[in-house]
Amino acid sequence: MCIRDRRAGVKALVAPDCPLGLLGAFHEGKQALLMCGNNLPDDPAVVWVVLAHESAHVMQLCNGGNLMPAALLSREVELARQQDPNPFHELQLYHSSQHHVEAEARLIQALPEEQVVALFEKHCAKRLSP
């Protein structure tokens, strides 16, 4: 995924000094995806979830906004919450203006790798350079 992020014009960085609890972030203005090396466990599954989540924000940038309409997002979040409510508890920590993009990212982080890559290529195809 990091290679695709770079091809889309986004820098992928690993920080050794993130605030406690922060696993990753995407800074739209700097077009940088940050992975927090000091907080991520040595577990490829966890690293993948964080990378998929932050790559969802890259997809939103490529798409020029939300990836799905609000009604569809509501239905998908409700279905996902029935399977695992945990990823959605943190939404209340965000300003309400961020709920849609963060909910989309949480849905994407739960998808299999192949689907995440396919979505990335779909939404960022115009930005991907050979």
Predicted segments with their positions:
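Metalloprotease/metallohydrolase-associated module, dominated by Zn2+-dependent proteases
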Residues: R7-L20, P69-P130
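Conserved small/polar residues in nucleotide/adenosyl-binding loops
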Residues: M1-D5
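Catalytic Zn2+-binding segment of zinc metalloproteases
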Residues: S55-L72
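Soluble non-cytosolic domains of exported or imported proteins
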Residues: P41-V50, H95-A103
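Non-transmembrane alpha-helical segments in soluble domains
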Residues: W48, A52, A56, R106-A110
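Active-site scaffold of zinc-dependent metalloenzymes
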Residues: K11-W48, L61-C62
